[in-house]
Design a protein with these regions (language model features):
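Catalytic-core helical/loop segments in enzymes performing group transfer/polymerization on anionic/lipid-linked
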Residues: 1-565
Length: 565
């Protein structure tokens, strides 16, 4: 590929910095090898600092690209090296923090290049800014602690202590997960309890990770639990003041364990790593994870018997906390990690590493949705047990039947939670000529409100867009093309015979959740409207998937085998 620079030969390596399409594609190509380097690097970082136990709750070690900028920085440093190796005439490289400034400057000297490194600051004192951010994080932790500790006391509602051995079901939840009748909507394992035999179903207790933004959130959820027929272990009802103090002080102490920093690209990147570690001091992520760890100690002290733990496994720090908590206080209990979703390889942490397994932060077995994912999940840890399990969240998908002779005149925009990516999708569609014979329908991510979205992306108020709230399966019969990014919706669309476009990212790498799972004849990565038009013109709108995409149905037998893992 011939690499080209635009914008007066400047290379913008900031978050959100716009790249030429050629460089954006080169960055995506490079990123596949950087994933391997990144995984190896975190192992060396952990070894250099002798990390053990709760040290693994620091986000720097997690390989989650949505929690730290390390992976993104590594990719962009390799992109810069590629530009230098291809003798591109760089005048300016723009960065946004001191760590990248030092690393880029070191690469410049290493290659004998001559360009200006521009450090785009927001003005003001960097020290004061870091201090104010630290105070803000402390204030957030105090606020969360007060809500979580005080509200259960004020409600004066006793927690329910199981009187028999239980199956612990880990999941995320919010107040809106109770319907108008008071029934709990299981968005993680739908159909599991209904499919199990009565004796097994009665042993299942939901242990939700709550999204608490206001005092009423916790109050309403606890009241909802009381009305529900399901059984719940609400962590906030079990913790005491010492647990919050423990989490508070450990959230200050643990990130400071990172002191020795290996080189990357042959240059010193200690400022990048230490800055990311500093951002984790008093962070809500590490605080919540430490509370989850202590939760298992409280359960053990109350003599709660756990037969099995099912972890909604994204290999985030909260998942690590669950694994460490179980292995510390319930060492004989088996942990089943359930990945009831399909994401791209950009989400590096979803593939466990050998050093995470040795540290005890991964489940005993990890369940995936498709046979093609088994080898992917074993890439960095061949000894990790990976199996295909029932696709609980995709039951409606497996029951879907195409509507014959339907008028497919909709381009469905299934927008992700990330606003920047959603904005790119909207902007691409606005570049399609106005005499277009298709309608653009916007389906927002469940956590994003229309009001908030229009504030962030005012372009979406254009009359060519219509917001819809119907389910994907109700929309698919009339959909000619789905436009999205790294989402399970892409897989669902292909399964239902709808072609897919993955928006090409010009500010970072582009990854498709369909790569290696679905034939590329049904999807493409697009950076411009011409690609969208070509996909519409060349794709058969009545195609059927091949057998290797089949999901495991939810049956009594498959549910029983899942619980027995």
């Amino acid at each position: 590929m011939v690499l080209k620079l635009r914008m007066e030969n400047s290379l913008d390596l900031r978050s959100g910095g716009l790249l030429s399409i050629e460089l954006a594609k080169e960055l995506t190509k490079i990123t596949h090898s950087v994933r391997d380097e990144y995984t190896d690097y975190i192992g060396r970082l952990a070894q250099s600092n002798s990390l053990t136990g709760l040290d693994w709750l620091v986000n720097v070690t997690c390989r989650n690209p949505y929690q730290t900028k390390i992976f993104d920085n590594f990719c962009k440093l390799r992109l810069l090296e590629s530009c230098l190796d291809n003798n591109l005439q760089l005048n300016t490289v723009i960065v946004e923090d001191e760590g990248m400034y030092e690393a880029v400057d070191a690469l410049c000297r290493k290659h004998g290049a001559n360009f200006t490194v521009e450090f785009a600051t927001t003005g003001g004192s960097a020290v004061l800014s870091r201090f104010m951010h630290l105070l803000r994080r402390v204030a957030i932790l105090v606020y969360i602690s007060l809500i979580s500790f005080v509200i259960p006391i004020l409600l004066k509602k006793k927690k329910i202590i199981p009187d028999h051995s239980i199956i612990y079901l880990d999941m995320f939840a919010k107040v809106s997960d109770f319907d108008e009748n008071g029934d709990f909507i299981d968005r993680h394992y739908p159909g599991l309890l209904q499919t199990l035999e009565r004796g097994q179903a009665d042993k299942a207790w939901y242990a939700p990770i709550l999204s608490i933004r206001a005092p009423d959130d916790l109050k309403l959820f606890i009241n909802g639990v009381e009305r529900s027929n399901n059984r719940f272990l609400i962590m906030e009802q079990w913790l005491n003041a010492s647990d919050y103090l423990f989490a508070f002080f450990q959230s200050f102490k643990l990130p400071r364990r990172i002191k020795k920093v290996p080189d990357y690209c042959g240059v010193d990147i200690s400022t990048i790593i230490l800055r990311e570690s500093a951002l984790d001091i008093f962070s809500a992520g590490i605080f919540d994870s430490l509370l989850r760890y202590r939760f298992f100690q409280r359960l053990k002290k109350s003599r709660v018997k756990i037969d099995k733990v099912i972890d909604w496994s994204e290999n985030q720090v909260v998942d690590r906390a669950l694994c460490l908590g179980v292995r510390s206080f319930y060492p004989s209990v088996r942990i089943i990690g359930y990945q009831g979703f399909i994401v791209s390889e950009y989400y590096v942490s979803h593939e466990p590493s050998w050093y995470e397994r040795e540290a005890g932060t991964t489940p005993d077995v990890i369940c995936v949705m498709n046979e093609a994912l088994v080898s992917r999940k074993k890439k960095y840890c061949p000894d990790q047990k990976i199996v295909v399990a029932p696709a609980f969240r995709f039951m409606n998908l497996m029951n879907y039947h195409s509507v014959v002779d339907s008028v497919r005149d909709i381009i469905l925009l299934a927008l992700p939670v990330h606003i920047d990516t959603s904005r790119m999708i909207i902007q691409l569609c606005l570049r399609v000529h106005e005499d277009f014979n298709y309608k653009f329908h916007i389906k927002l991510h469940p956590t994003v409100t229309k009001k908030k979205f229009l504030v962030e992306v005012p372009e979406a108020s254009d009359s060519r867009f219509k917001f819809v709230e119907d389910s994907l399966y109700d929309l698919f019969p009339d959909t000619a093309l789905l436009v999205s990014s790294d989402s399970s919706a892409c897989f669902e669309a292909i399964y239902c015979g709808v072609a897919v476009i993955i928006i090409g990212n010009r500010t970072g790498p582009t990854f498709s959740p369909l790569d290696g799972i679905v034939s590329s004849e049904y999807w493409d990565v697009c950076y411009d409207p011409d690609c969208l038009m070509k996909m519409l013109a060349t794709t058969d709108q009545s195609f059927k998937i091949n057998r290797d995409m089949q999901l495991m149905p939810v049956t009594k037998e498959s549910a029983k085998e899942f619980i027995a893992l």
